[in-house]
From Swiss-Prot:
One of its GO terms (biological process) is carbohydrate metabolic process. Belongs to the DapA family. NanA subfamily. It comes from Escherichia coli O6:H1 (strain CFT073 / ATCC 700928 / UPEC). Homotetramer. HAMAP family: N_acetylneuram_lyase (MF_01237). One of its GO terms (cellular component) is cytosol. This is N-acetylneuraminate lyase 1. Its main location: cytoplasm. It is an enzyme of class 4 (lyase).
Amino acid sequence: MATNLRGVMAALLTPFDQQQALDKASLRRLVQFNIQQGIDGLYVGGSTGEAFVQSLSEREQVLEIVAEEAKGKIKLIAHVGCVSTAESQQLAASAKRYGFDAVSAVTPFYYPFSFEEHCDHYRAIIDSADGLPMVVYNIPALSGVKLTLDQIDTLVTLPGVGALKQTSGDLYQMEQIRREHPDLVLYNGYDEIFASGLLAGADGGIGSTYNIMGWRYQGIVKALKEGDIQTAQKLQTECNKVIDLLIKTGVFRGLKTVLHYMDVVSVPLCRKPFGPVDEKYLPELKALAQQLMQERG
């Protein structure tokens, strides 16, 4: 059901203007930029997209704009997860209406829901998605929900689930999931261990830094398919040098600043309470943007 979703999927950023409103023109440019750099698909409205500081209406607008720009060109996954099941269902129905290829949802967070309540939450969203495969989103560091291997097994075998976004540094668990579920589409979620995640069994990845250097991650996939571990490791090291800088600056605002210097995003701001990049990092981010543009050609 979801085998066509394998690949390198950029976790799409959401541009805002100086007044903190959606910057629709920059969003359209960013979608086209990702298409042009050879990304297999987009993961829209997730953590990188600052979904949880947007209204439901804004999240629907983002889905609609992305579909207008990219439907039929690359694969589109709509992250529809909310704490509220009803709101998640509303977004899932919108994703279906706009022509997305799949939906995804983070485990419901903040309140200490039981595991059965998690399962009911996913079943309801899957029902509202009306045939679109579900990508379960496991990100314990941000959700606070630490799923056991048995719980992951249960979630990924729910009717309608076709994939798992595994944003965890536990490569042993990644391998265990692959061993138990050989046909499951499995995404690596942490960019800094992309190559290792592929070796542990991931089919591809969903990541934020793909927005500025997606071709490097495609290069890692190609190298590993050819058995060239040395090249894959070299590319991963180059990616991680960038990630080192972004961690210092704040990843999302750092990425937006690089894209601003690439003339893709007009305003390099995240939505409050996120603040701007510290000015002391701007020269490094500008140099990085120039380096990546030259490398991309």
